[in-house]
């Protein structure tokens, strides 16, 4: 690793969008500011759905509207107003149905496929860190966006990395609540529960603590499977493997918890089938090894030492810091697209776009 040393407020390749006001206003600002990126994501997920679920965009849209839109409207009508704003802001013939389809991409595609993300939560003295790499196909980097949102009539502000057109993903809020996400491949699906990316936004917008976040998850349930690493500024944190048939808590040991893309929490029923890639097992084992080594050698958790762990290339190309496998084609061309690190006691974060083992500008988050 050459070291990421250039400090910036914005990334030169991924836009930062500041959104305030009503749900529709937030959506319109989002959509109009990254219109090209929203259209790019529609194009890319049209391809992605064809590869993973063997359906066209039109078929995916019909599935999204018939199975998931009624639930979102019932559980959180304001977020539908925001999605409508995104569609009208992005223009070019996009409709609310298209944006809903983007926001249920996990429910459509990831019951058949999983990406490759590695995440960590670590409590170090008075510091509470969350960190992860987000791995996906290279083309999706062109559709990434950093969203800063201040909803009307709320004292909570949000910062998160997302994909243009998608209302929630990986990030933190000004109350000191943060979340990381790992895809879990499981066929379990319940359209009466909240879709994954809508849930991520709900947590960031309303949870002031770890306990709040757990209560929200329990209240609404997850439409498909996802892993969350959740933490708050008090230092309370844990990993929760969420699924439509139940949630499985993994408590920290030795001051940390690590996860990748397979279920391993206690209590999972045998009927909940898991289909991870082999590298999911090796990546989480390697993250544990690196974390234990640092602890044994007295190396404190900091943004710099976390970045070093997330830059690890042992087992390349399917390493913590991924590179595209030689000869890989289509959706097998996974690579690390971005790294998100958060320290919740100070409500600060550092983000790099690209593989963290390379020399990249650091985007700083604060409130």
Please tell me what each predicted stretch does.
Residues 1-115, 204-247, 252-367:
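C-terminus-biased signal that marks the final domain/tail of proteins
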Residues 102-199, 337-341, 349-351, 358:
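Internal mixed beta-strand/loop scaffold within catalytic domains of large alpha/beta enzymes
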């Amino acid at each position: 690793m050459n070291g990421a040393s250039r400090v910036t407020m914005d990334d030169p390749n991924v836009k930062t969008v500041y959104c305030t006001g009503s749900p529709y206003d937030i959506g319109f600002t989002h959509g109009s500011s990254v219109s090209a990126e929203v259209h790019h994501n529609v194009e890319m997920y049209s391809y992605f759905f064809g590869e993973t679920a063997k359906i066209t965009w039109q078929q995916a849209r019909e599935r999204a509207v018939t199975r998931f839109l009624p639930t979102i409207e019932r559980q959180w009508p304001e977020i539908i107003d925001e999605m409508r704003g995104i569609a009208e802001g992005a223009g070019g013939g996009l409709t609310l149905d298209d944006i809903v389809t983007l926001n249920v991409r996990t429910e459509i595609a990831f019951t058949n496929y999983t990406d490759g993300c590695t995440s960590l939560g670590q409590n170090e003295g008075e510091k509470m860190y969350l960190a992860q790499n987000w791995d996906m196909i290279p083309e999706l980097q062109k559709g990434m966006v950093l969203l800063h949102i201040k909803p009307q009539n709320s004292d909570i502000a949000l910062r998160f990395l997302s994909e243009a057109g998608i209302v929630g993903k990986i990030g933190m809020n000004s109350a000191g609540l943060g979340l990381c996400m790992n895809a879990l491949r499981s066929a379990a699906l319940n359209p009466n529960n909240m879709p994954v990316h809508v849930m991520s936004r709900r947590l960031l917008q309303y949870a002031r603590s770890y306990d709040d976040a757990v209560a929200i998850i329990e209240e609404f349930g997850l439409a498909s499977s996802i892993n969350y690493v959740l933490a708050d500024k008090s230092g309370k944190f844990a990993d929760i493997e969420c699924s439509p048939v139940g949630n499985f808590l993994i408590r920290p040991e030795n001051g940390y918890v690590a996860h990748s893309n397979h279920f391993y929490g206690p209590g999972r029923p045998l009927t909940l089938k898991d289909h991870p890639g082999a590298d999911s097992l090796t990546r989480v084992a390697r993250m544990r090894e690196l974390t234990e080594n640092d602890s044994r050698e007295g190396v404190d958790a900091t943004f710099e030492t976390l970045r070093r762990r997330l830059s690890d290339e042992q087992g390349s190309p399917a390493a913590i810091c991924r590179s595209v496998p030689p000869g890989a084609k289509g959706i097998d061309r996974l690579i690390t697209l971005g790294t998100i690190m958060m320290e919740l006691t100070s409500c600060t974060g550092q983000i790099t776009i690209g593989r963290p083992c390379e020399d990249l500008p650091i985007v700083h988050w604060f409130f």
